[in-house]
UniProtKB/Swiss-Prot annotation:
HAMAP family: RNApol_bact_RpoA. It is found in: Plastid, Chloroplast. It comes from Huperzia lucidula (Shining clubmoss). Its EC number is 2.7.7.6. The gene is rpoA. This is DNA-directed RNA polymerase subunit alpha.
């Protein structure tokens, strides 16, 4: 989304606020919501966006099947009499089952079904603390009157865990476990002028897709709490710090001026890597020239100095001045 929806811009200045502007259930295993956080100072949106994205994809716990035990099976690609799918296919299907658990402990579940019939998630005998999100998720097809017995291990964790081949023994097969309940996260940053047009502000727009075991709103809450917990040690350290002399602290933490400049420039590049040059509102000539030299974001533009632009063929002084003026006006920045 490159164009700013003016209806989302807060009507009055003040503290940043967070709200859901769209929410829908696309299927039992796909929930979608869109949020905005605004108004923010220039640079704050990307900082928050990066932290929240990491927390949403890596910190929120989810529940899934991590191991399946079959009777008289020794290899993942084995087939079973009367079962249409191979063991490998059943493992893949089991991996996709979306579950929700109130317990953090590893638990067992069972499938014990006589065919012929189709086996779905609703046929899993689950502990009382675990529920299935989509009962019709396919697991296997029994083509004749035989019994399918599978013992399942269910765990709750965060992130992703690869299978351990060493555990392929005694009919036990581990699967690649995708614990995160978040399917996808997108965010974009949009700049707008304050009401008196004296300063630029930012709006952070967030889109979240979940697997149905958690709503995007709940995910935002969990990710926020996780992110806040990261900074608690700094608050606790304040109570425990020793009584150093102010001048000693200042001297020990001081950076050489040249180092400070480099650090500041690197911070700016990271901050503006998601802000596109469209926000500068340049003339077609200046805009097209920047695109031609692969300058797509403000971060890309910071790789060039004023002299670099002036020396480029077919790039006039007027266009350079326009870029410098737009950078200063919208972001309070100058090229080296």
């Amino acid at each position: 989304m490159n164009d700013l929806d003016l209806n989302l811009v807060p009507p009055t200045a003040g503290s940043a606020y967070w709200r859901c502007v769209e929410s829908k259930v696309e299927s039992e295993r796909l929930f979608y919501s869109r949020f905005i956080l605004s108004p923010l100072k220039v640079g704050q949106a990307n900082t928050i966006g990066l932290v929240m994205r990491r927390a949403l994809l890596g910190e929120i716990k989810g529940t899934c099947i991590t191991c399946a035990k079959f009777e008289n099976i020794t290899h993942e690609y084995s087939t079973m009499d009367g079962i249409q799918e191979s063991v490998h296919d059943i493992l893949i299907n089991s991996k996709e089952i979306v579950l929700k658990s109130k317990s953090s402990e590893a638990q067992k579940a069972f499938i014990s079904i006589v065919g012929p019939r189709r086996v779905t998630a609703q046929d899993i005998e689950l502990p009382t603390s675990v529920e299935v999100i989509d009962p019709m998720q396919h697991i296997a097809t029994i083509t004749k009157k035989v019994k399918l017995n599978i013992e399942l291990k269910i765990e709750k964790d965060s992130g992703y865990r690869r299978q351990n081949i060493v555990e392929y023994k005694d009919g036990n097969f581990t699967v690649d476990a995708v614990f995160t309940p978040i399917r996808s996260v997108n965010y974009s940053i949009h700049c707008f002028e304050s009401h008196d047009k004296s300063i630029m502000k930012e709006m952070l727009l967030y889109e979240i897709w979940s697997n149905g075991s958690i709503t995007p709103e709940e995910a935002i809450y969990e990710a926020s709490r996780s992110s806040i917990n990261l900074f608690l040690p700094f608050l606790q350290a304040e109570k425990e710090k020793e009584d150093f002399k102010g001048e000693d602290i200042h001297e020990s933490n001081a950076l050489h001026p040249s180092v400070s400049i480099v650090v500041d420039q690197m911070a700016k590049k990271v901050t503006f890597q998601h802000i596109f040059i469209e926000q500068l509102e340049l003339s077609p000539k200046a805009y097209n020239f920047l695109k031609k030299i692969n300058v797509h974001t403000i971060s890309d533009l910071l790789d060039y100095s004023q002299d670099d632009l002036m020396k480029m063929k077919n790039f006039g002084k007027k266009s350079v001045e326009q870029i410098l003026e737009a950078l200063q006006k919208r972001f309070g920045m100058r090229l080296q």
